[in-house]
Amino acid sequence: MCGIVGYVGPQSALDVVMAGLKRLEYRGYDSAGVAVLADGGLATAKRAGKLVNLDKELSEHPLPAAATGIGHTRWATHGGPTDANAHPHLDNAGRVAVVHNGIIENFAPLRAELAERGHELPSETDTEVVAHLLAEEYSACADLAEAMRLVCGRLEGAFTLVAVHADAPDVVVGARRNSPLVVGVGEGEYFLASDVAAFIAHTRDAVELGQDQVVELRRDGVRVTGFDGSPADVRSYHVDWDASAAEKCGYASFMLKEIAEQPKAVADTLLGRIDGSGTLSLDEVRIPPGVLREVDKVVVVACGTAFHAGLIAKYAIEHWTRIPCEVELASEFRYRDPILDQQTLVVAISQSGETMDTLMALRHAREQGARVLAICNTNGSTIPRESDAVLYTHAGPEVAVASTKAFLTQLVACYLVALYLGQVRGTKYGDEIGDVVRDLSGISGAVERVLGTMDPVRQLARSLAHKNTVLFLGRHVGHPVALEGALKLKELAYMHAEGFAAGELKHGPIALIEEDLPVVVVVPSPRGRSVLHDKIVSNIQEIRARGARTIVIAEEGDEAVVPYADHLVRIPATPTLLQPLVATVPLQVFACELATARGNEVDQPRNLAKSVTVE
């Protein structure tokens, strides 16, 4: 959620930190601040609101030149979005500065202890206690990394901490527990950040920090230890995208750019995973085939858009493998005492690899003996590291808060998992699996075709900008697509939108239908299971008879829907189970255009964060 940047090196620390914070704006925030070490002391600036407010403060009251600094964009949890609650937080002497992501669950008793010892804590935040505790420990040991280890031993909750001390002018110290923090390694300079995007303009070499570790950056190197002080093994890796991938490149918004990048993202996610004979080759799936053959249940855990990918995966997994599949909201999973064992495969889906609810669900599953396969877009993140295996999507950085290309690549990865399980287990649908693999190989071109026909969708969206409600209907895999379309409209347009299984209309939702109410209907292919198609055509007739304005998404050549569609959006003919890959795209464009017409910020919708790293 929050964005954190730290820097030690020869450049202007303030310039590096501010540029890094701007690259992390997509994570969502409501205040920002910086601290630099200069002239034997600390200099800070912080302001509520967007970074432009902090820029203004810095132009009016410049900070001294410095080579060491930290910065933060805050998403309010404890205390409102005010100047006083913005980070960095200082001790009473103004010698320690701390920035923090996460929640310190035992901050209240710690705050009371500090108050009893005479500390004054003017903010409402949980973070402030850390600055005061660090000051106490540093006064005793004169070692900022050791002080951080001692303080972390007293904290409960999930947190990333980054701190500097005026007495250690070339040192930045960080710590992580259940919250992301990554080290950037440059030429004689080092970076700390909650996301590699913060330093990608300077280096693509990174170090992955493990759970309960403290890192110390100095001009001459990096040292990583556990909270207990023992040396820690770390993994270095090279980021496979550059700074231009996280820039708009002429598009009006990151979301529009990322929608347009979907054909390439889909193709990249398939690259190298299908050999010349049409056989799947998933070397990343380190779970032995013999173990996969013993799997008797699959459980998908995810949140938000990734949950909708999981709902679609259920249809594919059960059809191609004949293994029962459950799909769970990660935030609810561990609280209902799920039945798991060594024959259970848990698939954890997360774009960032740091989604806290999904991470906690994963850990619960492993405690019960289940195998965990992660589907993730972010190398070096926590969820892949703590899973038995990982299938990376290759969407590249997704900056807009509302997920688009990550969703399509998650779908591709889910299909690959389902097909691979079917291939390993030798199910009776083996011949069909070969056909589907060939269809998947051509899906990038189908997505490209959809994108080339979106002008009528944009025009329609603009004409509906004054509406307050839009409903979405679908059957089979079209139902999760309807849910995803509704979610996108909620996130971006701030309007009431609901997705329903079309067969549930008569069980309540039909009461919402009124004159000129826009209803988007995702129509399954008339080929194959034609009963699904026939029933949804009846649903369209039913709502249109009650005055609804029908917006119908149907494949090319489907003439049965034409008499009942007020607006018809054509998509390429695709096998039923793969249809979400093309049917979702018009809904993304629709939501983005409608939100823009309403004057909303599509890249950073209100109240939302890109990576939800707290429960």
From Swiss-Prot:
It is an enzyme of class 2 (transferase). CDD domains: GFAT (cd00714), SIS_GlmS_GlmD_1 (cd05008), SIS_GlmS_GlmD_2 (cd05009). GO terms for biological process: carbohydrate metabolic process; fructose 6-phosphate metabolic process; protein N-linked glycosylation; UDP-N-acetylglucosamine metabolic process. It is found in: Cytoplasm. It catalyses: D-fructose 6-phosphate + L-glutamine = D-glucosamine 6-phosphate + L-glutamate. The active site is at C2 (nucleophile), K610 (for fru-6p isomerization activity). Keywords: Aminotransferase, Cytoplasm, Glutamine amidotransferase, Repeat, Transferase. Homodimer. PANTHER family: GLUCOSAMINE--FRUCTOSE-6-PHOSPHATE AMINOTRANSFERASE, ISOMERIZING, GLUTAMINE--FRUCTOSE-6-PHOSPHATE TRANSAMINASE (ISOMERIZING). The keyword Transferase applies. Residues 287-427, 460-605 form the SIS domain. Its main location: cytoplasm. This is Glutamine--fructose-6-phosphate aminotransferase [isomerizing]. One of its GO terms (molecular function) is carbohydrate derivative binding. Residues 2-220 form the Glutamine amidotransferase type-2 domain. Catalyzes the first step in hexosamine metabolism, converting fructose-6P into glucosamine-6P using glutamine as a nitrogen source. The lineage of its organism: Bacteria, Bacillati, Actinomycetota, Actinomycetes, Kitasatosporales. GO terms for cellular component: cytosol. Pfam families: GATase_6, SIS. It comes from the Bacteria. Its EC number is 2.6.1.16. InterPro entries: GATase_2_dom, GFAT, GFAT_N, GlmS/AgaS_SIS, GlmS/FrlB_SIS, Ntn_hydrolases_N, SIS_dom, SIS_dom_sf.
